[in-house]
């Protein structure tokens, strides 16, 4: 006596998380031949092999990895840079622009940078991160004579976009990702980075530091700004 086998069917299985996954089920009705040659039915058996896909695997995790890399980079590079400002603070949506068309510089707490107060706590030669144009981490520079430089230095490496810490001991910016180096004004002196760090004007408006896009000649290279 021939046995009957049903074709595989597709079943929607539910997981504990409420998500569903497709599984293939095979329904078989086996026959058993006894000593008298008679067929005896057994219960219908259903074998279901489900392949569940975790929810996290369904969502691209590139953004999550990038964010964690940025935060980790900041934590690892702080001892090298000798700074107390966590880089993660600066990866927030940029604030509204100032009335003059510039972007107010923000400190690690998100407060406006008051030039006179900044100079009281940052000595000559200091380079400290603030939030600049488009929310980019940007260094405010204190000149050797104790005045605030009229330019800010974008901290994003021109190689692959890592945040570059300032190494005060060597008086230059050194990227921890692939070893690119820039002098204390952000001009590239060693690859693989192909270009110098971008600049922004650092103006003072009503006592506050304001960043304005730099579209003039790059004073470090004598060339047009590649970022404009």
From Swiss-Prot:
Top EC class for this record: translocase
Disulfide pattern: 162-177
Residue positions binding [2Fe-2S] cluster: 157, 159, 175, 178
Feature: transit peptide: 1-49
Keyword Phosphoprotein assigned: no
Cofactor: [2Fe-2S] cluster
Transmembrane spans: 72-92
Cellular compartments annotated: Plastid, Chloroplast thylakoid membrane
Name of the protein in its database record: Cytochrome b6-f complex iron-sulfur subunit 1, chloroplastic
Cofactor info, note text: Binds 1 [2Fe-2S] cluster per subunit.
Residues annotated as domain Rieske: 115-211
Species this chain originates from: Nicotiana tabacum
Reactions mediated catalytically: 2 oxidized [plastocyanin] + a plastoquinol + 2 H(+)(in) = 2 reduced [plastocyanin] + a plastoquinone + 4 H(+)(out)
Classification via Pfam families: Rieske, TM_PetC
């Amino acid at each position: 006596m021939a046995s009957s086998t049903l074709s595989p069917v597709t079943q929607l299985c539910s997981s504990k998380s409420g998500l569903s996954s497709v599984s293939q089920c095979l329904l078989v009705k086996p026959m058993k031949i006894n000593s008298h040659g008679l067929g005896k039915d057994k219960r219908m058996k259903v074998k279901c092999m489900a392949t569940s896909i975790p929810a996290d695997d369904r969502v691209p995790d590139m953004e999550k990895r990038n964010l964690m890399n940025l935060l980790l980079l900041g934590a690892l590079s702080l001892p090298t840079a000798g700074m107390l400002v966590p880089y993660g603070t600066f990866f927030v949506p940029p604030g509204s622009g100032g009335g003059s068309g510039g972007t107010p510089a923000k400190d690690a707490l998100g407060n406006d940078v008051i030039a006179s107060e900044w100079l009281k706590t940052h000595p000559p030669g200091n380079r400290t991160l603030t939030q600049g144009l488009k929310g980019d981490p940007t260094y405010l520079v204190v000149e050797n004579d104790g005045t605030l430089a009229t330019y800010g230095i974008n901290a994003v490496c021109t190689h692959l976009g890592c945040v570059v810490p300032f190494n005060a001991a060597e008086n230059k910016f050194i990227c921890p990702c692939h070893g690119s180096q820039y002098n204390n004004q952000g001009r590239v002196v060693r690859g693989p980075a192909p270009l110098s760090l971008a600049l922004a004007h650092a103006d003072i408006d009503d006592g506050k530091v304001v960043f304005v896009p730099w579209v003039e000649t790059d004073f470090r290279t004598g060339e047009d700004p590649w970022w404009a």
